[in-house]
Amino acid sequence: MNEQEYMKMLYIIDDYYEGDPIIIQWSNGLKVKCKSTSGIFENDAEPEDDDYVGEYSIGVSEVEVLKKGNDNSVKIIDNSIEICIWNIPEKITKEDGTVLWEREE
């Protein structure tokens, strides 16, 4: 994923959120409903990291697990998930199924 696509994904979460929940899905099968966001913030990624495409993340909270993942690769801490370069979802939708963003391979 290039930096432009990564930032687009972050801004879709940040810009869309108007109080309506969003559904986020990961490749491990985890599917959650999120009711709030922290906004975009700087993270600890460094330019020398092999998978560096940016130093920004977004936190989603008030997380309700709709489907459990098949591993623990996505951490839910204090009812929140940090979406960052090491934790990129596969798909983001509205509750009605309208796709807001989908990962390109």
PLM regions: where:
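Conserved RNA-binding domains used in RNP assembly and mRNA/RNA metabolism
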Residues: N2-P21, Q25-S27, K31-E105
